């Protein structure tokens, strides 16, 4: 059976047993901030197992895409060198949430593996392990399924603590846990290795293919196990492993899925497909990279993006080792899509995006890869011992972009190790330097501790009545605020919007009789809304009734910009592709700022397309509609959620233009798109690797921006004695005239230089039979000095020349050496000394070099270096 057939058979088998087929979740965990990547089938069901989420089904089956690279579960260094380590793998799993338990789970597993209709594995080839004290599972296997006792193994606590066992699963030190039973396949006596639990269990003869976890206990802090009211089942079977068994091969890289990727990798690199470790690395890494990019991860220098960058660069290095010339990795994406795109449609829809991202990252790394490898080779040649020092590893990381594990990979090939502790010390020193260069203000939200839920009334109102429930000054709870004091007011209800989702908090004032508190900002901590400001008059006490007044004009302008960000987000996905995801935003009354995932600058024609699409939606004047619903219904309607935001059971869905823009959002918005009036993009640029930023203005601010641009056009037209209508023609004429004058100036400068050359040649001094000339000619640019040096070399014959000038407040230097002297004296060497003397850099060929600097006062001293340079070199 092919891998795709095995996957489909597994899903279909459990559907026939009443399970709901659930699509693989993203590789970016949406409900577990402790996880870097999804690494098991149960990740997306974690809240179901914890009883925190109820779904419409109690039985589920899935084929989950998983990544193990970075963090606690990191297989990266072993990938390519072993038969079964991968950065990406598929986990087939069936799950019961308080439905069936051990008997059914064991029976299902055995029937799927051994039934002629399904996998038809020989029963005598299967071994089973259970937790030592799990008599229930042991009896089911031996008495009901019929596995003989000689192929059953009880595994006890083999990891140094109670319930610390290969056959006892825990979610953490406390919480759901339980025994598990594992099924192993025996490859036969011709393969070395012993059964599970034996001293030889790490051999390749007995391979674990399926693990069934029985969550039946809750472990409390005192270590006591308490039975769960509704036990559950979590199982996992690696697709690659079971495929190897069914296809009668001993390495996962020999299965059909990898054979096509290995062939495509060899073709892209231009090498033979001979199962080298480096080729396996490339074939493995294209899977993790392709799926990570499809799920929205982009290469960067932190978090998930850095793990992706490490994997890409490791693949590039191994391709380079196999002889790849230029970019090759992105060429393998098509083979990945052909192999896995049917099961995972996101690969098909994102193919072009994946290829562009990989190619851009390859090209960026290529600029430093060769140079970094040379530096490493030099360091290894000088190495005494078998450990690469931490400072060398750090230098390669910091200067040439070599991730630590890439250097470790290269060291491993030489039977060397790296000093990881030394590398971490260098990294920490860099972090300390970064922290010392930064300053941070106090987070007053973190200082305010209040157990209050403020009711928000501001979706349809900007004023109302409320009661003061808490007051804070300098982060401390107080009973009263006096005139002139800054503080924080917490109310039982408020129309003030608290900063969230990129929208700034409302401002305004609170009135309590003759007392007035000016609200400058509103934030939120827990369920409490914090009104930050100053008491302008009177005094304010806890329990006082107040009238709330939001600055309506500011709120309205902010709401227009917020709605415009939603339209812009939708337009970006239409123009650039579905890979675009919001990475941050800032919306206030003056403008909007929107950060999003994209790997290259946006072209001018794309900027125009974005504006056209958004303004077309504005002109439609469609209603901005909101709906309260549950999260699953919202997702079914196509609502986009901001990754990293925690949503409750009920969410607010905001729609504009029908299905043009549908997002989860709790912010304040326009009533109709036409209220926005107009959107104008005023800037676009990069803010981090793989993240771009657009700034835009709307409504009155957009009109003011266009009016200012119109005034600039009029002023420019006036300067060239033209009008707006003929400004381009007038500017073209001025520029053409300017070019003609510059050409005339160059000709005059050349004549002046020729005349100066006749005069300067007489100033040369003789040093050991060589004419040496070092002269200062202020006002001359580098081009004029180059021409003059050429002329002087012809006039002087055997000569060394250094000319310097202060031009436009910068030092310009040109050095020349006649070719008969370049074996002993090099212009580039002279230039390095002279440029360093004026606080700059320089270099060039042996016969001609250029440089410059910023210290005009040191120019004469730099020129004086010429004679000693010649004397020492001859």
From Swiss-Prot:
Its cofactor is Zn(2+). Zn(2+) binds at residues 562, 566, 665, 669. It is found in: Cytoplasm. GO terms for biological process: alanyl-tRNA aminoacylation; negative regulation of DNA-templated transcription. Gene3D superfamilies: 2.40.30.130, 3.10.310.40, 3.30.54.20, 6.10.250.550, Bira Bifunctional Protein, Domain 2, Threonyl-trna Synthetase, Chain A, domain 2. It catalyses: tRNA(Ala) + L-alanine + ATP = L-alanyl-tRNA(Ala) + AMP + diphosphate. Keywords: Aminoacyl-tRNA synthetase, ATP-binding, Cytoplasm, Ligase, Metal-binding, Nucleotide-binding, Protein biosynthesis, RNA-binding, tRNA-binding, Zinc. SUPFAM superfamilies: Class II aaRS and biotin synthetases, Putative anticodon-binding domain of alanyl-tRNA synthetase (AlaRS), ThrRS/AlaRS common domain, Translation proteins. It is an enzyme of class 6 (ligase). Pfam families: DHHA1, tRNA-synt_2c, tRNA_SAD. It comes from the Bacteria. GO terms for molecular function: alanine-tRNA ligase activity; aminoacyl-tRNA deacylase activity; ATP binding; tRNA binding; zinc ion binding. GO terms for cellular component: cytosol. PANTHER family: ALANINE--TRNA LIGASE, CYTOPLASMIC, ALANYL-TRNA SYNTHETASE. Belongs to the class-II aminoacyl-tRNA synthetase family. Consists of three domains; the N-terminal catalytic domain, the editing domain and the C-terminal C-Ala domain. The editing domain removes incorrectly charged amino acids, while the C-Ala domain, along with tRNA(Ala), serves as a bridge to cooperatively bring together the editing and aminoacylation centers thus stimulating deacylation of misacylated tRNAs. Catalyzes the attachment of alanine to tRNA(Ala) in a two-step reaction: alanine is first activated by ATP to form Ala-AMP and then transferred to the acceptor end of tRNA(Ala). Also edits incorrectly charged Ser-tRNA(Ala) and Gly-tRNA(Ala) via its editing domain. This is Alanine--tRNA ligase. It comes from Pseudomonas fluorescens (strain Pf0-1).
């Amino acid at each position: 059976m092919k891998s795709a057939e095995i996957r489909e058979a597994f899903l279909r088998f459990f559907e026939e047993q009443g399970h709901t087929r659930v699509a693989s979740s993203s590789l970016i965990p949406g409900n577990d901030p402790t996880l870097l990547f999804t690494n098991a089938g149960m990740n997306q069901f974690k809240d179901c197992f914890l009883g925190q989420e109820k779904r419409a089904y109690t039985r589920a089956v899935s084929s989950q895409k998983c990544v193990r690279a970075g963090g606690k579960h990191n297989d990266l260094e072993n990938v390519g060198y072993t038969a079964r380590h991968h950065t990406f793998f598929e986990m087939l799993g069936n799950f019961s949430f308080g439905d069936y338990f051990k008997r059914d789970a064991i029976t299902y597993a055995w029937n799927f593996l051994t039934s002629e209709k399904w996998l038809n594995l020989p029963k005598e080839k299967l071994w089973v392990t259970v937790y030592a004290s799990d008599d229930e599972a042991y009896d089911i296997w031996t008495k009901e399924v019929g596995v003989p006792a000689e192929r059953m193994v009880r595994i006890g606590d083999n990891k140094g603590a109670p319930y610390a066992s290969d056959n006892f699963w825990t979610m953490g030190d406390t919480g759901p846990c339980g025994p598990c039973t594992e099924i192993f396949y025996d490859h036969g006596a011709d393969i070395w290795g012993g059964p599970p639990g034996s001293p030889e269990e790490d051999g390749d003869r007995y391979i674990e293919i399926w693990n069934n976890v029985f969550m039946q206990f809750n472990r409390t802090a005192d270590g006591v196990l308490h039975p769960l009211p509704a036990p559950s089942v979590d199982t996992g079977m690696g697709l690659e492993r079971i495929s190897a068994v069914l296809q009668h091969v001993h390495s996962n890289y020999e299965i059909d899925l990898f054979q096509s990727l290995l062939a495509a990798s060899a073709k892209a690199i231009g090498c033979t497909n001979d199962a080298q470790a480096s080729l396996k690395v490339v074939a493995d890494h294209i899977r993790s990279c392709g799926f990570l990019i499809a799920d929205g991860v982009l290469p960067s220098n932190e978090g998930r993006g850095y793990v992706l960058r490490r994997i890409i660069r490791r693949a590039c290095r191994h391709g380079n080792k196999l002889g790849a010339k230029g970019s090759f990795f992105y060429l393998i994406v098509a083979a990945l899509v052909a192999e896995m795109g049917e099961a995972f449609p996101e690969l098909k829809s994102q193919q072009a995006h994946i290829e562009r991202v990989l190619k851009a990252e390859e090209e960026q790394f290529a600029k430093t890869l060769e140079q970094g490898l040379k530096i490493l080779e030099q360091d290894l040649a000088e190495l005494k011992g078998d450990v690469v020092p931490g400072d060398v590893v750090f230098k390669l990381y910091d200067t040439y972009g070599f991730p630590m594990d890439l250097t470790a990979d290269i060291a491993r090939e030489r039977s060397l190790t790296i000093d990881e502790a030394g590398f971490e010390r260098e990294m920490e020193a860099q972090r300390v330097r970064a922290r010392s260069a930064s300053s941070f203000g106090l987070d007053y939200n973190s200082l305010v501790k209040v157990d209050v839920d403020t009711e928000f009334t501001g979706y349809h109102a900007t004023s109302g009545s409320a009661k003061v429930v808490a007051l804070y000054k300098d982060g401390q709870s107080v009973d009263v605020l006096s005139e002139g004091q800054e503080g924080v007011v917490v109310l039982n209800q408020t129309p003030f919007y608290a900063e969230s989702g990129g929208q700034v908090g409302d401002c305004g004032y609170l009135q309590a009789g003759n007392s007035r508190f000016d609200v400058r900002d509103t934030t939120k901590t827990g369920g409490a809304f914090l009104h930050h400001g100053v008491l302008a008059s009177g005094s304010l006490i806890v329990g006082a009734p107040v009238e709330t007044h939001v600055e309506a004009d500011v709120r309205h302008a902010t709401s227009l910009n917020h709605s415009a960000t939603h339209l812009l987000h939708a337009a970006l996905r239409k123009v650039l592709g579905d890979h675009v995801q919001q990475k941050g935003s800032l919306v206030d009354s003056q403008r909007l700022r929107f950060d999003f995932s994209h790997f290259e600058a946006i072209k001018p024609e794309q900027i125009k397309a974005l504006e056209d699409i958004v303004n077309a939606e504005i002109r439609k004047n469609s209603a901005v509609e909101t709906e309260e619903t549950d999260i699953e219904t919202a997702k079914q309607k196509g609502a986009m959620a901001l990754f990293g935001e925690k949503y409750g059971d009920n969410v607010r869905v905001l729609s504009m233009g029908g299905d043009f823009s549908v997002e989860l959002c709790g912010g304040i918005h326009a009533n109709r798109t036409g209220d926005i009036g107009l959107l104008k993009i005023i800037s676009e640029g990069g803010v981090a690797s793989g993240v771009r930023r657009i700034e835009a203005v709307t409504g009155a601010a957009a009109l003011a921006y266009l009016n200012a641009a119109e005034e600039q056009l009029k002023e420019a037209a006036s300067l060239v004695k033209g009008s707006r209508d003929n400004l381009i023609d007038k500017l073209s004429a001025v520029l053409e005239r300017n070019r003609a004058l510059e050409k005339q100036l160059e000709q005059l400068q050349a004549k002046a230089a020729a005349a100066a050359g006749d005069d300067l040649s007489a100033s040369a001094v003789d040093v050991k039979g060589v004419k040496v000339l070092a002269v200062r000619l202020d006002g001359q640019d580098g081009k004029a000095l180059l021409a003059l040096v050429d002329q002087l070399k012809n006039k002087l014959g055997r000569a060394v020349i250094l000319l310097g000038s202060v031009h436009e407040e910068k030092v310009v230097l040109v050095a020349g050496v006649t070719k008969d002297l370049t074996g002993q004296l090099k212009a580039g060497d002279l230039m390095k000394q002279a440029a360093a003397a004026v606080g700059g850099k320089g270099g060039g060929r042996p016969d001609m070099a250029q440089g410059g600097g910023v210290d005009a006062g040191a120019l004469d001293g730099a020129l004086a270096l010429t004679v000693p340079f010649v004397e020492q070199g001859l």
